[in-house]
Amino acid sequence: VLAFDYLIAPNTGLGYVLGAVQLTAAALTAYTAVRLLMGARPMTLPERRAEPDKTADAGGGALTCAAEKRARDELLHPQDHRMHLRGRDFAIMGALTLAYSVAAFWHLGATKAPQTGYVSTAAGETVVLDLGENQEDFHLYYYGGISDTQFTVATSVDGESYGVETGAFFDRGECFKWLALREPTYDADGVAAGASGGMIALNGRYVRLTFDGAGSALWEVAAVDGNGRVIPVQAIAASGAVEGRAADPNALIDEQDTVPEKPTYENSMYFDEIYHARTGYEHAHSLHTYETTHPPLGKVFMSWCIDLMGMTPFAWRFAGTLTGILMIPAIYLLAMQLIKRTRWAALSALLLTADCMHFTQTRIATIDSFPVLFMMVMFLFMARWMQMSFYHQKLWKTLVPLFASGVFMGLAIASKWIGCYGAVGLAVLFFSRFITLYKQSVYAKRHRDEDPAFARAADGFAKKGAATLAACVVFFVIVPIVIYCLSYIPYLSAYGEVKLNLKTLERIWNAQVTMFEYHKNLVATHYFSSPWYEWPLIVKPMWYYSAAFPAMGKASTIMAFGNPAVWWTGLAAILFVLGYSVYRNALPMLRVTRGRDDEYDRALPIIAVGFLSAYLPWVLVSRLTFIYHYFASVPFIILATAQGLRYLERRNRALSHALTAVLVVAAVALFIAFYPYASGLEVSREWLARMNWFKNWMWY
């Protein structure tokens, strides 16, 4: 197992067996979670029954003795839906959020990048740079936008006789990157297929760029000496452009202050930024988008930052990074809503702060961070509603968290379709609680004369229940659809003025069909792909970036993976949470009665349903999957960890606190140790090798 040499392919026989086991366990867990939410007590052994279950026909329902007692207890003693936030809670949230913000924004990306450029209009069009005098052993850097063609480079001493033309590879996948003229690589047929060799050392006074065709969008070109210093361009001229359409070649050298010492992730796009951040740029300029395989909202957020700060690495990563920062208070509030203890809310926030996946995935300009935050918040508001009751609070007050949950559900789905997975979890939680409220009304009708609270519940369910269901149609159907459609406004603006008509709706619908067909028919292979059952164990981290030109003896890399202390502990914790649900409800013969922890049991199924809704659908996905698809499950395994330690605290306080301290120290220490892998910080290869714990684990 530790060699990680097994089950790399997601379609192995054992993978199917594990999938079947997972589905069976999940079905049983979902059943027991629903029973918990609906107010069921653990079943009792036959010999312990004093008498058969009592039933009643009043109200058209029948309740067991245990369910009657639960209904009576909550009608007389409603749940506490408040978080009980105090000054120290805000202080802890603020401190953790501030600390994480500093780490997240440090070396996030350059705040300067070329903003203007030169677009070729014809094949054979040339631009000549005059460096003023003959230069030796210099390199050529270039930065481009969205381009369709390539160009070649040649140098000359006198401006008349040029040397061999060298291809400067530059295509759609190389947009918004600083690139260096490098030695070409060749395919099996001897055809140049890329450039991954060392930088080419150039000599001469004149540098000529010759474009292969129209549409090559270069935003800046620079000659750089061996020490990384920019060599000033004394003059520049262009020829061969289509008459009347020639661009100003000075746009190629007008932002030389943006030229970096060397290309790195800090000044260039990497991994899927070439799709998502590029689409943000296209939205900002009302262009037709290249990437249409996911809903647009996350890319719209990026476009807003690009509008405000320009097309720079810092700008296109800002929205995702801010989202990662907001996850810290979000999980703190979610933990307080569920557990209502500062200690465990602080632990939850700290573990998320120290998680490597959270750090890496929110600093890259992809869309995955947005739905995760929105899913956390939509579960937060649903949990709040579940702790309320329209028997005890005014109806409109109970509808507020439902409305908020629906809004964030819409935002999650409009960011990425994984929000639909979470929506299923919300539905399970909502209807389970709604049925519980119905059961309470059944009990109240039979005992309405015993207490005014029973009379209110007996008379109130029909009207308030119907109003709640009607409101939920608006909150969880109409509102999300409206949000989803509104998120397409920037996409539609590329076609002209956006109007509400059948053509607009048809375009939105066709975009959904295109998305669905893409994911349904996707057939691809990838060395770093991994099946769902490997993610919790961090079997195969996902490689995002390696520096092309690191210093001698050093390396810079970015990998997506979890903090072992957080994920491996979280795996044990979520198994405990799922297993404990079964233990409390389906295995009574093993249960030793020691009293009941109501707050624990009410929080437990919410965590279980949240985790299963984020994770379980991936068991059924046959397409290529990666470890970052586990990201949405991470908040729930962290909450499970806090719940598990809290459960232990009730039985052995000293042991619980000792394990908590060990976990905190381990999580922080491992985050620091793995920080170079998570951040791209250039460090010695020796350190990276030391942290490469298993065979074929990390990449640098």
What residue spans do the PLM features occupy?
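Short helix- or helix-capping micro-motifs
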Residues: 348-353, 360, 380, 409, ...
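Membrane-interface transmembrane helices that cradle and orient dolichyl/undecaprenyl
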Residues: 378-401, 412, 431-441
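Short acidic/glycine- and proline-prone juxtamembrane loop motifs at membrane-interface regions
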Residues: 316, 320, 357-370, 415-418
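Transmembrane-helix motifs of polytopic, lipid-linked glycan transferases
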Residues: 314, 318-339, 377-381, 580
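Transmembrane helical bundles and short interhelical boundary loops of multi-pass, membrane-embedded
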Residues: 2-37, 41-49, 53, 57-92, ...
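Aromatic-rich transmembrane-lumenal/periplasmic boundary elements in polytopic membrane proteins
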Residues: 229-280, 461, 481-538, 685-692
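Transmembrane-helix signature of polytopic, membrane-embedded enzymes
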Residues: 331-354, 372-373, 391-397
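Aromatic, loop-rich ligand-recognition surfaces of beta-strand-rich domains
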Residues: 102-175, 183-270
